Amino acid sequence: MFKYTRFEKARIIGARALQIAMGAPVLIDVPEGITPLEAAIMEFEKGVIPITVIRPS
């Protein structure tokens, strides 16, 4: 798995949590009553978030 900086990780999880809160489908099975932020963190840990990071070369 790719190593992200803490800033990249925060941006990815925050953006995905916002998407989930706005109605995007969750890509993993999550328990009932979980918050969008918790769901985004679980997706990040499993490596299934459909967001890419482009770094300058």
UniProtKB/Swiss-Prot annotation:
The keyword Ribonucleoprotein does not apply. One of its GO terms (cellular component) is cytoplasm. It comes from Pyrococcus abyssi (strain GE5 / Orsay). Keywords: Cytoplasm, DNA-directed RNA polymerase, Nucleotidyltransferase, Transcription, Transferase. Belongs to the archaeal Rpo6/eukaryotic RPB6 RNA polymerase subunit family. This is DNA-directed RNA polymerase subunit Rpo6. GO terms for molecular function: DNA binding; DNA-directed RNA polymerase activity. It comes from the Archaea. InterPro entries: DNA-dir_RNA_polK_14-18kDa_CS, Pol_omega/Rpo6/RPB6, RPB6/omega-like_sf, Rpo6/Rpb6.
